[in-house]
């Protein structure tokens, strides 16, 4: 049977925290991935839950992604507990920062995921009937993404507005002067109630089960607090990882049983209450959730708080839970109990008085009627297994996950399920109860290492043993079963065990031992070579399954691997994406070019009769073009505004500020461009700037991959000049000056660069050799032996030669057969590069070859030229930026043995 090739290496379901983190991990590995999400934008549950007052009760400093340090540096939350819109903005920023949005299909609901034993491939089918296939399946569907269905008779008959918090509409809703009924007093209901009470004409709260609501004690984050967060971030996360609930709260070491009397207990509780939320829950007494007596003392303190806050005694008693603190997840909110002191707020106890909806509102079984304009359903979620059970997931031998989990909820460490090969669950059932982002980092990292192991070793599938899954599941059940809260959670309809959903079997959905006790299970697998896992190997036939194994020079490398390399950029410091900065750089440059053209024309000036004639024509053509006019019309700036923009643009801003005002003088020969761009090493720094750095870093990353496999390779760099690319390569391949290759030959047309380079690169002096090379002439006549080098690097130099085919043929002579040519080149003329390099004579070396507009070539043109001169063509192209802003790339090509030996003819 012919095996199919999958569409992607991996498919991710869900674009919330877990999905975004998973996409980045897959991109890091160089794998192709597709993410499907039913929402219209990123966020997962944070996209759907847009109800008034929605915010996290996890503190900002631990409710974030942590896979790279710039995520912290580039973003500041504004409050201790970020609101929904900030969480969504944050995730959207991450998508755009790492160009992940292109891999996501929004408004796409997944209906089924079926595994093929024959092909080791998952087939994903969407609600619209679209089918996509992949080797790896990563459900990152979340634990609170499936709303609980409203069970109320007569809901369709209601003539007013009905909204469910978990599917809140995007449009604005008016609440003022309306009679509003809210059904539900879990975390969501409490936030809605607190937010709407001040604006509603009347707010009727229908409560079945009261909750222990702890004040959040939210506050805005000032600049000092934000600085402190960044300084102590790693230490704070270490605390959160050790905390059983994943929050940055140290265990107090105190026990109620050994406290120094009622006054001391009261003092500790009051202090925790004043600090709020998890400082009260987790930072007062360590036995509050462990010991029945300690729990009773804690519960009674909260009940006394309720009675002291709520003025109406009957209302206060209805708000007081009678079950133990922690049997249901305690919500956190500011001002909740105070809300019931308002004259427009009424609490209705429906614990033993069922409700139904009629055309005018809600009525109880006892006969009370409440006329309403709006009903808000805050009913909670089918947590834990709900989202995955909604998808028809079938593993090996067509085994239904939904049916398997109905019998017993089983996983291995919350990540793998026996019988479902290559399915990596990301923060689903058996996730440690508590703060998800802290657990997510450990899960995503382990999944990435496991997939990387499979890719490196040619493994087709992974499946955890039934014994390992049973051992973990039994551990989860024993940890929960050993708590006195287990029985109460079942009785109180807690979503911890799923009994909030009618008919759903009582199963512990989460792990109550914390990530500190889960992660060792994962680490053990890494340390023992995945001893609890079985793998199948890719043979020759199975290789057609579509494993992404692109190799250049014997190294596994893909554009995705290189383009996902994280590079600290100046744009990061001012909160811009690289694409945003590039757009501003070119817009600011265009303003100066426009002013120069206007001055030249109005004064009747002519350029000096040399290469500047070509430069002048290109500038005029740009200003007169539709594209130029569009850029200029979109860049309407006063001189002061232009200066402010340029000041934010780092090295590129220096170039614009220095060269822009001198364009007319350079054109007319009154001054020379080199006098400006060489001052203060500006030209050298241009190659290290955001505009020039990404493709250079790709070159360095490929060199690192190559030299990590072979230390005997010989490297030659053409036109190394100021050493910008060299520095990137050496810092990555040999950060401490250690040996990494047999030879690194540093060449340039002029020896004048060598002394400065020897000083700059002194750490690597024992590895470097320096020799003059004019690549336009035969290398053999300059003392170079043919077919000597394994890797030749040329960064933004080949285009500045007179005859490209002649130059490339000379490069080919220096490479061994099978050697790799790494060509970093600009691929599109931008206003900035026209200003920076168009002002230099070397830019126009190719005029006689017909390159009069620009010396630059597109990747397609380079592909053709390389094939003409003894190379394989472009084996790989990795670009600097997405879409229309891209203008630079790394091209890798292999030297063929049947070489062209005559200067391209």
From Swiss-Prot:
InterPro entries: FAD-binding_Monooxygenases (IPR050775), FAD/NAD-bd_sf (IPR036188), Flavin_mOase-like (IPR020946), Methyltransf_12 (IPR013217), SAM-dependent_MTases_sf (IPR029063)
Domain of life: Eukaryota
One example of a Gene Ontology biological process annotation: methylation
Keywords (A to Z) from UniProt: FAD, Flavoprotein, Methyltransferase, Monooxygenase, NADP, Oxidoreductase, S-adenosyl-L-methionine, Transferase
EC number: 1.-.-.-, 2.1.1.-
Keyword Transferase included in the entry's annotation: yes
Gene3D superfamilies cross-referenced by the UniProt entry: FAD/NAD(P)-binding domain (3.50.50.60), Vaccinia Virus protein VP39 (3.40.50.150)
Domain description: PsoF is a unique bifunctional enzyme catalyzing two different types of reactions at completely separate steps of the pseurotin biosynthetic pathway and comprised an unusual combination of two domains, one homologous to a methyltransferase (MT) and another to an FAD-containing monooxygenase (FMO).
Job of this protein: Dual-functional monooxygenase/methyltransferase; part of the gene cluster that mediates the biosynthesis of pseurotin A, a competitive inhibitor of chitin synthase and an inducer of nerve-cell proliferation. The PKS-NRPS hybrid synthetase psoA is responsible for the biosynthesis of azaspirene, one of the first intermediates having the 1-oxa-7-azaspiro[4,4]-non-2-ene-4,6-dione core of pseurotin, via condensation of one acetyl-CoA, 4 malonyl-CoA, and a L-phenylalanine molecule.
Listed name of the protein: Dual-functional monooxygenase/methyltransferase psoF
Provenance organism: Aspergillus fumigatus (strain ATCC MYA-4609 / CBS 101355 / FGSC A1100 / Af293) (Neosartorya fumigata)
Gene name as annotated: psoF
């Amino acid at each position: 049977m012919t095996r199919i090739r999958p569409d992607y290496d991996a498919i991710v379901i869900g674009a919330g925290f877990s999905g975004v983190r998973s996409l980045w991990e897959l991109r890091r590995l160089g794998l192709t991935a597709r993410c499907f999400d039913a929402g219209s934008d990123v966020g997962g549950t944070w996209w759907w839950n847009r109800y008034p007052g929605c915010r996290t009760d996890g503190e900002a400093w631990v409710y974030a992604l942590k896979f790279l340090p710039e995520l912290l540096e580039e973003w500041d939350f504004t409050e201790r507990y970020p609101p929904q819109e900030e969480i969504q903005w944050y995730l959207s920023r991450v998508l755009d920062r790492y160009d992940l949005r292109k891999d996501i299909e929004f408004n796409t609901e997944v209906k089924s995921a079926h595994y093929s034993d024959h092909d080791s491939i998952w087939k994903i089918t969407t609600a619209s009937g679209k089918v996509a296939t992949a080797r790896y399946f990563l459900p990152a569907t979340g634990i609170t993404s499936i709303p609980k269905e409203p069970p109320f008779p007569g809901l369709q008959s209601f003539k007013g507005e009905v909204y469910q918090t978990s599917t809140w509409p995007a449009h604005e809703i008016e609440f003022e002067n309306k009679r509003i009924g809210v059904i539900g007093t879990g975390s969501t209901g409490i936030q809605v109630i607190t937010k709407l009470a001040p604006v509603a004409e009347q707010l009727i709260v229908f409560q079945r089960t009261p909750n222990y609501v702890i004040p959040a004690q939210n506050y805005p984050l000032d600049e000092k607090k934000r600085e402190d967060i960044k300084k102590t971030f790693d230490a704070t996360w270490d605390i959160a990882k050790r905390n059983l609930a994943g929050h940055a709260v140290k265990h107090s070491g105190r026990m109620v049983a050994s406290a120094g009397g009622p006054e001391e207990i009261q003092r500790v509780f009051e202090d925790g209450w004043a600090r709020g939320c998890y400082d009260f829950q987790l930072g007062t007494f360590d036995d509050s959730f462990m010991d029945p007596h300690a729990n009773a003392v804690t519960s009674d303190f909260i009940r006394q708080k309720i009675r002291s806050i709520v003025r109406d005694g009957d209302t206060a008693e209805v708000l007081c839970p009678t079950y133990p603190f922690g049997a249901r997840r305690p919500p956190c909110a500011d001002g909740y109990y105070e809300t019931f002191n308002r004259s427009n707020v009424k609490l209705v106890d429906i614990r033993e008085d069922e409700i139904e909806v009629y055309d005018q509102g809600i009525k109880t079984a006892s006969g009370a009627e409440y006329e309403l304009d709006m009903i808000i359903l805050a009913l909670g979620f089918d947590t834990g297994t709900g989202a995955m059970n909604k998808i028809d997931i079938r593993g090996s031998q067509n085994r239904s996950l939904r049916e398997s989990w109905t019998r017993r909820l089983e996983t291995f460490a919350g990540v793998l399920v026996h019988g479902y090969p290559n399915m990596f669950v990301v923060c689903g059932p058996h996730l440690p109860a508590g703060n998800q982002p802290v657990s997510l980092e450990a899960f995503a990292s382990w999944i990435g290492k496991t997939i990387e192991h499979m890719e490196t070793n040619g493994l087709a599938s992974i499946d955890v043993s039934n014994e390992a899954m049973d051992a973990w599941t039994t551990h989860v059940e024993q940890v929960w079963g050993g708590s006195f809260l287990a029985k109460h959670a079942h009785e109180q309809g807690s979503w911890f065990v799923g009994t909030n959903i009618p008919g759903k079997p009582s199963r512990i959905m989460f792990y109550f031992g914390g990530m500190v006790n889960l992660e060792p299970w994962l680490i053990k697998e890494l340390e023992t070579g995945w001893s609890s896992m079985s793998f199948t190997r890719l043979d020759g036939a199975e290789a057609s399954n579509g494993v992404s194994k692109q190799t250049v020079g014997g190294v596994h490398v893909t554009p995705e691997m290189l383009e996902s390399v994280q590079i600290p950029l100046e744009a990061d410091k001012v909160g811009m994406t690289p694409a945003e900065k590039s757009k501003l750089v070119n817009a600011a440059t265009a303003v100066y070019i426009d002013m120069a053209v206007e001055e030249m024309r109005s004064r009747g000036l002519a350029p000096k009769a040399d290469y500047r004639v070509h430069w002048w024509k290109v500038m005029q053509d740009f200003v007169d073009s539709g594209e130029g006019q569009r850029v200029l019309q979109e860049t309407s700036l006063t001189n002061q505004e232009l200066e402010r923009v340029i000041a934010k643009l780092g090295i590129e801003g220096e170039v614009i500020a220095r060269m822009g005002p001198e364009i007319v003088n350079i054109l007319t020969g009154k001054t020379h461009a080199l006098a400006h761009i060489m001052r203060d090493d500006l030209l050298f720094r241009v190659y290290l700037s955001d505009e020039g750095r990404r493709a250079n870093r790709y070159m360095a990353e490929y060199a690192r991959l190559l030299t990590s496999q072979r230390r005997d390779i010989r490297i030659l760099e053409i036109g190394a000049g100021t050493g910008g690319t060299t520095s990137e390569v050496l810092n990555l391949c040999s950060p401490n000056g250690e040996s990494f290759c047999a030879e690194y030959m540093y060449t340039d047309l002029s020896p004048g660069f060598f002394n400065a380079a020897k000083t700059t690169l002194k750490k690597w002096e024992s590895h470097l050799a320096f020799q003059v090379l004019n690549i336009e002439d035969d290398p053999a006549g300059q003392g170079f032996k043919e077919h000597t080098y394994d890797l030749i690097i040329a960064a933004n130099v080949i285009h500045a030669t007179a005859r490209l085919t002649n130059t490339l043929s000379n490069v080919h002579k220096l490479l061994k057969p099978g050697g790799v040519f790494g060509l970093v080149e600009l691929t599109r003329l931008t206003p900035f590069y026209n200003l920076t390099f168009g002002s230099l004579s070397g830019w126009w070396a190719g005029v006689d070859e017909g390159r009069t507009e620009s010396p630059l070539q597109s990747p397609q043109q380079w592909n053709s030229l390389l094939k003409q001169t003894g190379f394989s063509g472009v084996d790989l192209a990795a670009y600097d930026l997405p879409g229309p802003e891209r203008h630079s790339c790394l091209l890798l090509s292999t030297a063929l043995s049947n070489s062209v030996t005559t200067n391209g003819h």
